[in-house]
Amino acid sequence: MGSLSFALPFAELEVGQHLYWQFGNFSIHGQVFMTSWLVIGALLALVVVGTKKMERDPRGVQNLLEFLWDYIRDLARTQIGEKVYRDWMPFIGTLFLFIFVSNWGGALVPWRLIHLPSGELGAPTADINTTVALALLVSLSYFYAGLSNKGLRYFEYYVHPTPIMLPFKIVEDFTKPLSLSFRLFGNILADELVVAVLVFLVPLVLPVPVMFLGLFTSAIQALIFATLAAYYIGEAVEEHH
Amino acid sequence: MDSITTAASVVAAGLAVGLGAIGPGIGQGSAAQGAVEGIARQPEAEGKIRGTLLLSFAFMESLTIYGLVVALVLLFANPFAG
């Protein structure tokens, strides 16, 4: 089977086809890189434009950025706690904005107009490699947060209520990145597939409400990823008494 | 891939999503029930309840999504394709 593709002008459905770039011994998925660079560029441009001429009464882009800053600060503060949330706010904010803009960019930008020799452009988060990388970053950072805040006392967390919990907590370290990455990847890919299949079956009107539902779930998934990352970091820095 | 592997993969993909949807479906139902009762009892807390409900919905939904990932692997990246 390998991969699947139907050929209708706007209803192509391709899974498992990629634009491979050779990079030394590695072959990388080029379409994912292109869209992630676009997302990063868009975010950078937004931030640069919004902070160029800052005013006391925020207007336009600055207003939007301040709203986002407040939102991310509240998210980080409720999950990580008053003491160290400030250190981790940039990380949580970056995760949230990158995932959010990737998800919405994949759904809103008419990528199908751009033809690639193989594969197609879409949300970078619909590729398992992106989400695994993000989830592993979260794993590394909660270990780092725990070790740098509490030193070796961090490992008390593994035996915290009773030592019986030790195997479960160790398994948890592996299941956390697994579930984080699969949840995001699966949701975004499922959204794209559902819309693609509906467009393939009924090209008019019917896919539109499903697209809105997709936008909604994509936003929620970005929020969940950021919330969980913050929660894991908060769990690692929390003091037990 | 021989036809018996294909048939088994397709059936398994259907079962993975179908069976995986049962549990989260029941769970989302009872979560929604709790939320509606909460809102009926205390309409001013609607915003907070809605936020928590959506977040927990996403967690339940991800269980079905795991089934979907398994189904997609079976259909598009089958390790037994040989």
From Swiss-Prot, chain B:
Name of a matching Pfam family: ATP-synt_C
Bilayer-spanning residue ranges: 7-27, 57-77
Site feature: Reversibly protonated during proton transport: 61
Membrane topology label: Multi-pass membrane protein
Disulphide-bonded residues: none
CDD domains: ATP-synt_Fo_c_ATPH
Keywords: ATP synthesis, CF(0), Hydrogen ion transport, Ion transport, Lipid-binding, Membrane, Thylakoid, Transmembrane, Transmembrane helix, Transport
Gene3D superfamilies linked: F1F0 ATP synthase subunit C (1.20.20.10)
Keyword Thylakoid: yes
Subcellular location: Cellular thylakoid membrane
GO molecular function, one term: proton-transporting ATP synthase activity, rotational mechanism
A GO CC annotation given for this chain: plasma membrane-derived thylakoid membrane
Chain's role: F(1)F(0) ATP synthase produces ATP from ADP in the presence of a proton or sodium gradient. F-type ATPases consist of two structural domains, F(1) containing the extramembraneous catalytic core and F(0) containing the membrane proton channel, linked together by a central stalk and a peripheral stalk. During catalysis, ATP synthesis in the catalytic domain of F(1) is coupled via a rotary mechanism of the central stalk subunits to proton translocation.
Family: Belongs to the ATPase C chain family.
Subunit structure of this chain's protein: F-type ATPases have 2 components, F(1) - the catalytic core - and F(0) - the membrane proton channel. F(1) has five subunits: alpha(3), beta(3), gamma(1), delta(1), epsilon(1). F(0) has four main subunits: a(1), b(1), b'(1) and c(10-14). The alpha and beta chains form an alternating ring which encloses part of the gamma chain. F(1) is attached to F(0) by a central stalk formed by the gamma and epsilon chains, while a peripheral stalk is formed by the delta, b and b' chains.
Cross-referenced NCBIfam families: ATP_synt_c, PRK07354.1
Protein name (record): ATP synthase subunit c
Species this protein is from: Prochlorococcus marinus (strain MIT 9211)
